Amino acid sequence: MQEHYQPAAIEPAAQKKWDDARIFNVSEDASKPKYYCLSMFPYPSGKLHMGHVRNYTIGDVLSRFKLLNGFNVMQPMGWDAFGMPAENAAMKNNVAPAAWTYDNIEYMKTQLKSLGFAIDWARETATCKPEYYRWEQWLFTKLFEKGIVYRKNGTVNWDPVDQTVLANEQVIDGRGWRSGALIEKREIPMYYFKITDYAEELLNDLDKLEHWPEQVKTMQRNWIGKSRGMTVRFAVSDDSKQGLEGDYAKLLQVYTTRPDTLMGATYVAVAAEHPLAAAAAADKPELQAFIAECKAGSVAEADMATMEKKGVPTGRYVVNPLNGDKLEVWIANYVLWGYGDGAVMAVPAHDERDFEFAAKYNLPKKQVIAVGDNAFDANRWQEWYADKENGVLVNSGDLDGLDFQTAFDAVAAKLQSQGAGEPKTQYRLRDWGISRQRYWGCPIPIVHCEQCGDVPVPADQLPVVLPENVVPDGMGSPLAKMPEFYETACPCCGGAAKRETDTMDTFMESSWYFFRYMSPKFSDGMVDPAAAKYWGAVDQYIGGIEHAILHLLYARFFTKLMRDEGLVNVDEPFERLLTQGMVVCETYYRENDKGGKDWINPADVELTFDDKGRPISAVLKADGLPVVISGTEKMSKSKNNGVDPQELINAYGADTARLFMMFAAPPEQSLEWSDSGVEGAHRFLRRLWRTVYEYLKQGEAVKAFAGSQDGLSKELKDLRHKLHATTAKVSDDYGRRQQFNTAIAAVMELLNQYDKTDTGGEQGRAVAQEVLETAVRLLWPIVPHICETLWSELNGAKLWEAGWPTVDEAALVKSEIEVMVQVNGKLRGKITVAADASKADLEAAALATEGAVKFMEGKPAKKIIVVPGRLVNIVV
């Protein structure tokens, strides 16, 4: 065995051994319990970042732990390869997105392999490959035929200069990120998935997810947003019907969760796209201008919540069905046409948003809820104004004095009797628009025919292949400029037709990839039925909490769609979810001449610390001049505080990177980058290596201790007790608790005790062998390369075949224990007694200790408190 730890030599050798034995390549095996462990697959951006390393190391630890415990472990990997960054990089570098993507995949795959992850690379999948998205297109056509996918107009951000649709994040202060042009809202035909048909099941099935973080489930419940309320129909005033047709000339319909406050409504607000707004604006330029302004604004609901609320009166009125009051209709920028009825009733006295709007435009506020003796002040919002739990109605005629639920029922009865409303359950969740006016995505498999309408592409003509030799110029959709792509024959009538040139939202690919991994080369369907039956749901899913809503919700939705198509036999995709924290690092900057900040990489900064090790000043190494310490933030390119994993691997080895990531913080918490922490991790691995080296230097490896320990010294018995207590703790930390930092700490403590124990002689050497073999197996999930090598030196066999160490219950039983002795609650000594010593024996032994005699000062004991197995407290 070589004397010094050399990761650059041992890590490739260990990886070759695993690859040659194909131990991570799995198939369905009914003789073993299955364990499907999956970390969210990466976008092939070019290089791994530390967040990737943490994410995939967590998954690898769990996978290797289960492998040693006899499970048939599948840990696949692939690439979420479609998306906007590839198009942006293509335009910047004048290269096709496909070429850029495939180059990145190759480099990142090399990086992942260098970290030694137990990945079944035979299952590798890239979502931009036709053999993958073919089945996505196939499912789309099936759902289109069933009506679960449908087409309707949707609102998008339109850049009039680049002639293209922009995502919300590409709109900066109302302008296009590339052209700088003022963005317009446009209505264009788009395809939608009826996720709302599954809203109730998506909500209810959250209760089945016992091993998901409660925070994630709460976020999904809020996103689905089930509410019980009422549809209320306000009659359009006779003097306000001009320009309106059909039902819109008769009624304005709104949904409210607070029908009890209907008597407090003082105006109604509608979206800019509402027919009533259009009718009112027909001869009013000021209304037309405001509507145009609204349409130029953001289409993101999140922006609606934070932007300044604006509105204009239409001069049109509707009638409150409860009291006959005429309420003016306002056009407001905070009302979304695509949500509900595109109209809301406003009760300024009891809704904070309406209160602010009414204050801005001097609209009346009518109190109809009272809470105790609290005084209503129309000039100042107070939280109790919206209290429906403790409030009762006032100023509401015969409804006065009613609580929320009673008033709800009474208003419902009145409105229903008039045909002016009815109770309704509504969801905040809206149908999922999947059309994207971009190139680098999965083509939508629809043909538009003037004779036959929208025709799904038949299964035998799939996939509709995306041309890969295209370099986008940012001016509209490239596919819409390629007759060779869009010109086709109608599958129904054979006449000239045009392919859909929109592509699918990239969330589509990530909504089912975990099923494709089960049979990635299966050519007769989305997933092989036998594989789907065996692997079932993902047992452990790992990823950032930023994916708590959209990705995880869409993945749950797709699972139910695929179940209903008979493709899988599970209701939920992920049994257990772990949301790892971010990797954060210090940030530093200097202010530049333009008033901005130039961010400086931590590697280029030299720090000065106070006597407690806290940084108090920083200078740039290059010039010795000060830089500002800006605090810790998530590693990012924008703050220039990232650390390249490849540099870390090159300097210290993959095991050091893995160990630091698992030891620095519990997995669900943020991990703060620390150079000293990395060095500490490397020191521990050198120490582990040295410990085994010194043991083998004294003689050849022996058979690990097993059997009765009656003949062992107390010191060796104590070491075996520590060993098996550590094994039990680490097993629980990996399996139930998923707290890897405490598992590592436990093994460190074990090695500390090993170093202090005399392991000479035949029995001592057998116990030493047992300790070292066990420590190596306990650490293999986290630092597999060094452990694989040390196991080979200690045992000569294959570690992955050795199995997880078992706990010797006999070793956990101590014949003697150490008990603290206190006098008046203060520690005055310790005694070693038989583990089964009686209360009287403990009292007698404690009273006889030197410390007790000294501090009792000859006084008699008033009381002796015995805590079995822990302490004796003598009270004098």
From Swiss-Prot:
CDD domains, alphabetized: Anticodon_Ia_Leu_BEm, LeuRS_core
Molecular function terms, GO-annotated: aminoacyl-tRNA deacylase activity; ATP binding; leucine-tRNA ligase activity
Transmembrane segments: none
EC number: 6.1.1.4
Span(s) of short sequence motif 'KMSKS' region: 634-638
Annotated ATP binding sites: 637
One GO biological process term: leucyl-tRNA aminoacylation
Subcellular location: Cytoplasm
Motif ('HIGH' region): 42-52
Source superkingdom: Bacteria
Main subcellular localisation: cytoplasm
GO (cellular component) term, any one: cytosol
Keywords recorded for this protein, A-Z: Aminoacyl-tRNA synthetase, ATP-binding, Cytoplasm, Ligase, Nucleotide-binding, Protein biosynthesis
Reaction catalysis annotation: tRNA(Leu) + L-leucine + ATP = L-leucyl-tRNA(Leu) + AMP + diphosphate
InterPro entries: aa-tRNA-synth_I_CS, aa-tRNA-synth_Ia, Leu-tRNA-ligase, Leu_tRNA-synth_edit, M/V/L/I-tRNA-synth_anticd-bd, Methionyl/Leucyl_tRNA_Synth, Rossmann-like_a/b/a_fold, tRNAsynth_Ia_anticodon-bd
HAMAP family assigned to the protein according to its UniProt record, in alphabetical order: Leu_tRNA_synth_B
Family: Belongs to the class-I aminoacyl-tRNA synthetase family.
PANTHER family: LEUCINE--TRNA LIGASE, MITOCHONDRIAL, LEUCYL-TRNA SYNTHETASE
Protein name: Leucine--tRNA ligase
Organism listed in the record: Neisseria meningitidis serogroup C / serotype 2a (strain ATCC 700532 / DSM 15464 / FAM18)
Lineage: Bacteria, Pseudomonadati, Pseudomonadota, Betaproteobacteria, Neisseriales
Gene from which the chain derives: leuS
